[in-house]
Amino acid sequence: MLVLGEEWGGDVIRGMRMLARVADAAGLEMSIFPRDQHHDIMNEYLKNGEWMSIPVAVFYTKEHDYICHWIERPISAELEIAEIGESIRAENPDIDEQAFGRARRERTAARAADWQQDSVSELKELLAASIK
């Protein structure tokens, strides 16, 4: 498994341990590449064809043939993060960006464990569908 990430990325901080456990459980070697030093690799796995979102986990066969890849966070987190943002702005219409970011981090931190479980489920489904 190839993983792209950076130490400062919130999703990387939340997701790296989960990815390491997945690799360990599956008996996979995990190689980590800093995104900002490997734009050539990162450009192959842009989210929605434009965003350098991390972490990215890329799965290969033993022969190094591509199987599939997973980017950033589970779909459930994407939906909930959007809802959290809307809720914060509705509660505080004049909130500045710094306070907004702080409030969003506080609320998303409470969901991290559930999102890790959702990530594992998503990875299982993705791999099962890709290996058929």
Where in this protein do the model-derived segments appear?
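Thiol-based oxidoreductase modules, predominantly thioredoxin-like and allied folds used
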Residues: L2-E7, L19, G27-M42, M52, ...
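Conserved redox-active cysteine motifs that mediate thiol-disulfide chemistry
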Residues: E7-R14
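Flexible, glycine-rich phosphate/dinucleotide-binding loops
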Residues: G10, H39, S76
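A short secondary-structure junction signal
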Residues: R14-G15, C68
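Non-globular targeting/processing and membrane-anchoring segments
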Residues: A20-A25, E29, E44-S53, K62-K132
